[in-house]
Amino acid sequence: MLNIDKLIIGFDSALRTLLAPANTLRPVPGKDLPENELSEIEKRESAALMRINHVGEVCAQALYQGQALTARNDRVRQALDQAAREETEHLAWTERRIAELGGRKSFLNPLWYGGSFTLGLVAGVLGDKWNLGFLAETERQVEAHLADHLQRLPHQDVRSRAIVTQMKVDEACHATMAVSHGGGQLPAPVKVAMKFSSRIMTRTAYWV
């Protein structure tokens, strides 16, 4: 059940996600790799793809925070909080890499955050089985989208590739965690709707 303390924590988390630089406890993947020379076209492509990945992490933060607010089981809430901390690291990694590439973050991050937070709240209200099932499916789709980015990133952009590779590993772990905690299999129409929404987000974030 929602209470004032949880709402304050949620509001603080939203401000930190959208306005404050993200922090990471783990070393940034690829930080010791060489910064190979990229053409302007390659830099723009890498920056756009990393912007999409950053938006994905903004959405993940919002989703986890919304789900944690309405989760009914303390064990589930703790698992969501742990995953959210790892997603914060992804936020920091992508943010840093965008800056290194001379790119910018999406202007629509508040919109992405608000929509994902609402989805997280709704998923949590439906109960932990569907809450975790929604999380697992989200992470599977994110993992697939990161695999696609590994195909699209310039081969010589080894720093971006190292970050995306580690993110892909972490997302797979989050999906496994959600299933192990009792996540249910979502109906096929819900999965299709999620893919459609994700496609709109990624195509928009590529440019905006």
UniProtKB/Swiss-Prot annotation:
CC cofactor = Fe cation
Q: Name one GO molecular function term.
A: 3-demethoxyubiquinol 3-hydroxylase activity
Per the record, its GO cellular-component terms are: plasma membrane
Binding residue positions for Fe cation 1: 57, 87, 90, 171
Query: Which amino acid positions bind Fe cation 2, per UniProt?
Result: 87, 139, 171, 174
Could you tell me the EC number(s) of this protein? 1.14.99.60
The family database entries (CDD domains) matched by this protein are listed as:
DMQH
Cofactor comment: Binds 2 iron ions per subunit.
Which Pfam families does its entry note? COQ7
Please give the pathway this protein is involved in.
Cofactor biosynthesis; ubiquinone biosynthesis
InterPro entries assigned:
COQ7_proteobact, Ferritin-like, Ferritin-like_SF, Ubq_synth_Coq7
**What kind of membrane protein is this, topologically?**
Peripheral membrane protein
Q: What keywords are annotated for this sequence in UniProt?
A: Cell membrane, Iron, Membrane, Metal-binding, Monooxygenase, Oxidoreductase, Ubiquinone biosynthesis
One biological process term from GO is: ubiquinone biosynthetic process
**What is the enzyme's main class?**
oxidoreductase
> Where is it mainly found?
membrane
Catalytic activity from the UniProt record:
a 5-methoxy-2-methyl-3-(all-trans-polyprenyl)benzene-1,4-diol + AH2 + O2 = a 3-demethylubiquinol + A + H2O
Q: Which HAMAP family match?
A: COQ7
Q: Which family does it belong to?
A: Belongs to the COQ7 family.
Which NCBIfam families does the entry link to?
A: DMQ_monoox_COQ7
Its recorded name reads 3-demethoxyubiquinol 3-hydroxylase
Organism this protein belongs to? Nitrosomonas europaea (strain ATCC 19718 / CIP 103999 / KCTC 2705 / NBRC 14298)
Q: Gene behind this chain?
A: coq7
